[in-house]
Amino acid sequence: MRAERRKQLFRLLGDLPDRRPISVETLRIEEREENIVETLLLDLNGHEKAPAYFVKPKKTEGPCPAVLFQHSHGGQYDRGKSELIEGADYLKTPSFSDELTSLGYGVLAIDHWGFGDRRGKAESEIFKEMLLTGKVMWGMMIYDSLSALDYMQSRSDVQPDRIGTIGMSMGGLMAWWTAALDDRIKVCVDLCSQVDHHVLIKTQNLDRHGFYYYVPSLAKHFSASEIQSLIAPRPHLSLVGVHDRLTPAEGVDKIEKELTAVYAGQGAADCYRVVRSASGHFETAVIRHEAVRFLQKWL
């Protein structure tokens, strides 16, 4: 049943490329005070190369656990992967690159379609072109994330069985979708991204989210909690702001109720948590603290 539901979800994501070996070009290696930053160019999909950063601790003994960092949207198309290193005005400091490497994790971030060094076409144009040619923008973004996992596992300095994912907003959505579709993700942490698409329709909030996220026929076959149930029983933490209009409370409550039952049914009640912060669509000190603590516990 689980495998079939996962196949069904993949089928909704449009015509995806065949899985392929990942080629990488190292453009630069920069040694910073606390970590080492590799600037990379990854051929993840055979259509368009993805610029990436891999950041690792300076002092490690052997391969390290690693985190796939998913950047947010925020209408900041020039940012992309640089969010990992530079942060954003809605994220706390230190940057996730400094935070995570200080804890001993390696971190990979890629530019998703239309962001960072892959910008040039508008998001709406990419969405429409892909729709016309049998592809789904969200599906191609997910494909790149799954290929990024292939690359992470190929690195000799990464422990291939200790990979987690984290992201904020669009990045949080990508984190839980990637975890739902691939068991190689051992821990999932999402920030400000518990969006129930059925509740968005009900509350007339569809226009609060970009074109990138809309998958044809998704609402006919899956709810948000049904997708995320594919993560269970692996550890999953969702961090939400109670005043976040992009994640209506009705949807968050529904997802939490249903996933709590799923995890309990699999004997993993302690592996799923929802933490609410008295805030809007941004990271708070509470959110950062809980995210870091969860990663340290499970990864």
From Swiss-Prot:
Belongs to the dienelactone hydrolase family. SUPFAM superfamilies: alpha/beta-Hydrolases (SSF53474). Keywords: Hydrolase. PROSITE patterns: PRO_ENDOPEP_SER (PS00708). The gene is ytaP. InterPro entries: AB_hydrolase_fold (IPR029058), Dienelactn_hydro (IPR002925), Pept_S9_AS (IPR002471). Its EC number is 3.-.-.-. It comes from Bacillus subtilis (strain 168). One of its GO terms (biological process) is proteolysis. GO terms for molecular function: serine-type endopeptidase activity. This is Putative hydrolase YtaP.
